[in-house]
Amino acid sequence: MAAAAYVDHFAAECLVSMSSRAVVHGPREGPESRPEGAAVAATPTLPRVEERRDGKDSASLFVVARILADLNQQAPAPAPAERREGAAARKARTPCRLPPPAPEPTSPGAEGAAAAPPSPAWSEPEPEAGLEPEREPGPAGSGEPGLRQRVRRGRSRADLESPQRKHKCHYAGCEKVYGKSSHLKAHLRTHTGERPFACSWQDCNKKFARSDELARHYRTHTGEKKFSCPICEKRFMRSDHLTKHARRHANFHPGMLQRRGGGSRTGSLSDYSRSDASSPTISPASSP
């Protein structure tokens, strides 16, 4: 408001100063020093100068009048004090909502209902029917590989401690547990040194603790090479030798060995297995 009043006052002063024209007097000279021809020639030019000044003054007055009209059309912004007063007035007009009073218990059964606090008017709205609240994804549903590995490790440890694996080694310092008694029996031979599987090849007196070890050894006598490379068709006696060889090829993929599995692949899993599980006894006489 003060700025607008100052601008109006300044514009009014400009109008007053422009309306009162200053009279310009020429230099005073004696009548003797000025020739008559010069005085006569100067008199016609005075009205032209006055006309130019009148035109300039009227143009400037018109510009100032337009400025004043524009200022009057613009509404002044309210002061901060007026804004606070208006906000306080609006706040005083709006009624304050108070929560309803708690009903007084009239019977012993109503005391439990009265113990619950009343729901205020500003409580959060309940979710609509058919809409479930968002749930944070657990570690099992996350897509991070690190979390998946942790979950798998936790599951494997839980499987080891599960009651299904009840066949435990009774030797001191050995905490291995197996799900089948045959697996435990094969493991106990590592402690006792028992080797019930003997080679029946002529002049070969080797014995083994597991039947798969005997079958692997027997192929050294027969020369059987049933594990063939899927790329170069080389053959090997043991599946682990085939795997090492196949990895040297540039176009090798682990799925190649799995596709060519068949019956021979399933029977050769014990060749490179590190488990203590015992496989069915293979009679050397049945092999070619």
UniProtKB/Swiss-Prot annotation:
Give residue spans, biased composition: Basic and acidic residues. Answer: 26-35, 48-57
Which InterPro entries does its entry note? Znf_C2H2_sf (IPR036236), Znf_C2H2_type (IPR013087)
Task: Give the tissue specificity.
Answer: Ubiquitous.
The PTM entry states: Phosphorylated by PRP4K; phosphorylation regulates its transcriptional modulator activity.
Q: Where is the composition biased (Low complexity)?
A: 107-124, 266-288
GO annotation, cellular component aspect: chromatin; nucleus
Disulfide bridge map: none
State the Gene Ontology terms under molecular function.
DNA-binding transcription activator activity, RNA polymerase II-specific; DNA-binding transcription factor activity, RNA polymerase II-specific; RNA polymerase II cis-regulatory region sequence-specific DNA binding; sequence-specific double-stranded DNA binding; zinc ion binding
PROSITE patterns associated with the record? ZINC_FINGER_C2H2_1, ZINC_FINGER_C2H2_2
Q: Kindly list the residue ranges recorded as spanning the membrane.
A: none
Q: Name one GO biological process term.
A: negative regulation of cell population proliferation
Pfam families hit by this protein: zf-C2H2
**Where Phosphoserine occurs along the chain?**
S268, S270, S279, S283, S287
Q: What is known of its domains?
A: The Ala/Pro-rich domain may contain discrete activation and repression subdomains and also can mediate protein-protein interactions.
* Designated name of the protein: Krueppel-like factor 13
**Higher taxonomy:** Eukaryota, Metazoa, Chordata, Craniata, Vertebrata
Primary gene name:
KLF13
